[in-house]
């Protein structure tokens, strides 16, 4: 529907669902947006637009009401579209977008397991990826591995310190910065097997130890991601990029200059607050240097659009990276940076206590173990990524309707249970018409068929929370319909079961796009 109206008006059209369903299936204030441009009153514009839809068989009624346009879809359109969706479940809500997109997300340092901050960005990125792929975009999910720099050296030191204290039983003085957590134990033991005990005491071999250990940490990270149904197409390692350093610096031209034995990028010329150091006086590259080479490599691969998902603490970093893209000769408008905000975790209303094995962070794997992958994914997709998120684990462990993921999954299971109780065959149900439904059934069908609009809107706006909001609303409509309407044994049993199948398809498709399982059976919730 959005696409039809977008084509008609040559712009994005805001669609609203009227609170009073008697007004129609949806409404739009487009006439108010056009009033200034056309120098006419919204009422007159709305009247003219309504008249232009008179011969359109998609709508049974298009009305102008005080400048608003109210649309009611025709019974034939809804019935035919619903039947088509059930006959073509694999293509329901799909499109054929042509744009080629590179989506980079997570990109956590290979120095320790993922924590809940990483988890939020991971779920956000993977949900965007799933939405884009469903819409037909040629999208690649990429992980940038920051395996160069001080943080890697610190990994080697941390393994040595852990091993000396816990394996050699030495008295160890810890520095101000180091990594901690039980994940270091297997790394220390494996290091001894590979290199011998001396690897724990030889400070000159910290780098060697770290470069070996990072692969083990990446396996931990990949396992954590796989346990939440998150997978990547490509991994790019920072350590492989610096062979291209001289060529990339030459491409930067006047964007790079030397001062006080340092190399700077003239990012202030491109909107940044200041120029930034890319190579220190001791010839060590900064974090930005790796990002410059990486983004050059990205753009040389020829995608149409590039999306980075970063932690909110990287907000100030956007301008300098976009400046480097401009100096490299590319259009920085093709680079979109989305931010993922902080997460606060409660358990029974109290701040969540970190486990001793995790060090000083709350591990993603701990939360998955406690509430499951489905609940974790739902939580992190349920609020705008650039706003702070606080949630209580206890709420998502409840097996009742107060738990939104249980509520949605139970709606799907309820549909399966109702259909299983019927004596009608699958073919008898599928051959039924979806016409001549009463108002409540008609609105439930409309709600189920809204999924394609929601999927496109959630991706284009980058607001993936619109999908779980929709699924929760659809589940509520289904549960209400179940209590208000008798189905089995009625004259309309076949068509009502077909309607429930359509709702089930939307629930299952929507949950799959969130990386969540649609349950076929669940124990009865406490209502």
Curated annotation (Swiss-Prot):
The protein's matches in PROSITE patterns, at most eight in alphabetical order, are given as:
AA_TRNA_LIGASE_I (PS00178)
Q: Which GO BP terms, alphabetically?
A: arginyl-tRNA aminoacylation
Output a single Gene Ontology CC term carried by this record.
cytoplasm
Q: Which UniProt keywords apply?
A: Aminoacyl-tRNA synthetase, ATP-binding, Cytoplasm, Ligase, Nucleotide-binding, Protein biosynthesis
EC number(s) given by UniProt: 6.1.1.19
Compartments in which it is found: Cytoplasm
Please indicate the residue ranges that the annotation assigns to the motif 'HIGH' region: 108-118
Molecular function (GO) terms for this protein are:
arginine-tRNA ligase activity; ATP binding
Keyword Kinase among UniProt keywords: no
| Catalytic activity reported | tRNA(Arg) + L-arginine + ATP = L-arginyl-tRNA(Arg) + AMP + diphosphate
Identify the domain of life.
Bacteria
Member of which family? Belongs to the class-I aminoacyl-tRNA synthetase family.
Its quaternary organisation is: Monomer.
Name of this protein: Arginine--tRNA ligase
Name the species this protein comes from. Sulfurimonas denitrificans (strain ATCC 33889 / DSM 1251)
């Amino acid at each position: 529907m959005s696409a039809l109206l977008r084509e008609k008006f040559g712009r994005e059209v805001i669609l609203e669902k009227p609170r009073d369903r008697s007004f129609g299936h949806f409404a739009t204030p487009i006439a108010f947006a056009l009033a200034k441009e056309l120098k006419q009153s919204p009422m007159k514009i709305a009247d003219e637009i309504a008249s232009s839809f008179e011969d359109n068989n998609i709508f049974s009624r298009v009305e102008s009401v005080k400048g608003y346009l109210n649309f009611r879809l025709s019974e034939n359109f809804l019935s035919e579209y619903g039947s088509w969706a059930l006959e073509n479940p694999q293509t329901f809500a799909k499109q054929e977008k042509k744009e080629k997109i590179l989506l980079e997300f997570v990109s956590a340092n290979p120095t320790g397991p993922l924590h809940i901050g990483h988890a939020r960005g991971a779920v956000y990125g993977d949900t965007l990826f799933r939405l884009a792929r469903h819409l037909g975009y040629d999208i690649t999910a990429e992980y940038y591995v920051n395996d160069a720099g001080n943080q890697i050296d610190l990994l080697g030191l941390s393994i040595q310190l852990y091993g000396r204290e816990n394996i050699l039983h030495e008295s160890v003085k810890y520095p101000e910065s180091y990594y901690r957590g039980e994940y270091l134990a297997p790394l220390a033991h494996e290091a001894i097997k590979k290199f011998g005990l001396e690897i724990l005491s030889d400070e000159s071999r910290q780098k060697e130890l770290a470069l070996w250990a990072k692969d083990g940490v990446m396996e931990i990270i990949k396992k954590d991601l796989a346990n939440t149904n998150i997978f990547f197409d490509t991994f790019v390692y920072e350590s492989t990029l610096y062979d291209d350093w001289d060529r990339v610096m030459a491409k930067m031209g006047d964007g790079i200059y030397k001062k006080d034995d340092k190399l700077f990028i003239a990012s202030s010329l491109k909107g940044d607050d200041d120029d930034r150091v890319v190579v220190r006086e001791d010839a060590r590259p900064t974090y930005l240097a790796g990002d410059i080479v990486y983004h050059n490599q990205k753009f040389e691969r020829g995608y149409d659009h590039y999306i980075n998902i970063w932690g909110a603490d990287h907000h100030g970093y956007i301008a300098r990276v976009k400046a480097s893209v401009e100096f490299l000769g590319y259009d920085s408008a093709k680079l979109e940076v989305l931010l993922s905000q902080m997460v606060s975790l409660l358990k029974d209303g109290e701040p969540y206590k970190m486990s001793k094995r995790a060090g000083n962070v709350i591990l993603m794997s701990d939360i998955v173990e406690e509430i499951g992958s489905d609940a974790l994914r739902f939580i992190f997709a349920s609020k705008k990524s650039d706003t702070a998120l606080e949630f209580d684990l206890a709420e998502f462990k409840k097996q009742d309707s107060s738990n939104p993921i249980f509520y949605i999954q139970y709606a799907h299971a309820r549909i399966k249970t109702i259909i299983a109780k019927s004596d009608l065959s699958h073919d008898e149900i599928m051959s039924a018409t979806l016409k001549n439904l009463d108002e409540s059934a008609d609105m439930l069908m409309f709600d189920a068929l809204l999924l394609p609009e929601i999927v496109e809107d959630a991706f284009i706006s980058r607001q993936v929370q619109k999908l779980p909001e929709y699924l929760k609303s659809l589940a509520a409509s289904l549960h209400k319909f179940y209590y208000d309407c008798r189905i089995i044994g009625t004259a309309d049993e076949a068509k009502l079961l077909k309607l429930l199948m359509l709702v089930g398809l939307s629930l299952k498709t929507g949950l799959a796009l969130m990386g969540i399982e649609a349950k076929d059976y669940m124990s009865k919730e406490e209502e």
